Amino acid sequence: MTDPAGLWHRLADSRVLLDGFHALKHAVRFGAEVTVAVTTDREATLALADELAPDVRPALDALLTEVPEPVYASLVPRPHPTAVAALAVRPSRAAHLERLARTERTAPVVVLDQPRNLGNAGAVIRLAAGFGATGVVTTGTLDPWHPTVVRAGAGLHFATAVERVTVGELPPGLLFALDPEGDDIRGTKLPDDAVLAFGSERSGLSADLRARADHLLSLPMRPQVSSYNLATSVAMTLYHWSLDGGV
């Protein structure tokens, strides 16, 4: 590619930023359409692929263009230690919504109700992909495809369905909302097509989502401890689901 920086600038506003080797690796592994990928050291990046991701090494060999460090730094908000970045096409919203709406899902949908922290949202998407969740949807103003979220998610947005919806647009299925006043989750079997909702750490569930919930559940927690990190709560809940046959 003769002018990767020029192509980058033309496409950046309409593409997903993959920031770092692991984000690019996961995106390629899960079928992302990558339109441009750059690195400051092509040989070192391909050696890293040989070591950590030999399955995607041929694809990275075809995609990566080496650029000078100042050029790379000009393309990203904050240089990544691996000095790798790429742009990919965002998956179809319509296809994601169709996938989320299926009534015979084999894994839960995670709902983040009005999340505030971009890093936490990315961490949830990363672990949801690891558990094979059908998808992660957010309500409120946070963009789940924000570059900081994608970076925190290590590119695993492409391994699951990630979208922003309203409470009225939540996927079908029994809605289990995590709330300190709910029943102990250890006494409940979560169905594979469950919709699992989590409020923000600061304000909890919104009134609209809480009113719509079919069941309120709580996580075991020592008295006088106020809350878990959002990603920790999601991980505990998905692990509980997985004990009955998930992942």
Show the residue positions of the predicted features.
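Boundary-proximal intrinsically disordered activation/regulatory segments immediately upstream
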Residues: 1-54, 141-142
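Amphipathic alpha-helical repeat scaffolds
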Residues: 20, 116-123, 226-231
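Short, aromatic/basic amphipathic alpha-helical patches
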Residues: 44-59, 148, 208-209
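Glycine/small-residue-rich loop that forms an oxyanion/phosphate-binding "nest" at active or ligand-binding sites
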Residues: 53-89
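Structured adenosyl-cofactor binding patch, chiefly the S-adenosyl-L-methionine
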Residues: 86, 127-131, 141-144, 148-157, ...
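RNA substrate-binding interface of SAM-dependent RNA methyltransferases
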Residues: 87, 91-181
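Active-site/ligand-binding-proximal alpha/beta "capping" segment
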Residues: 177-223
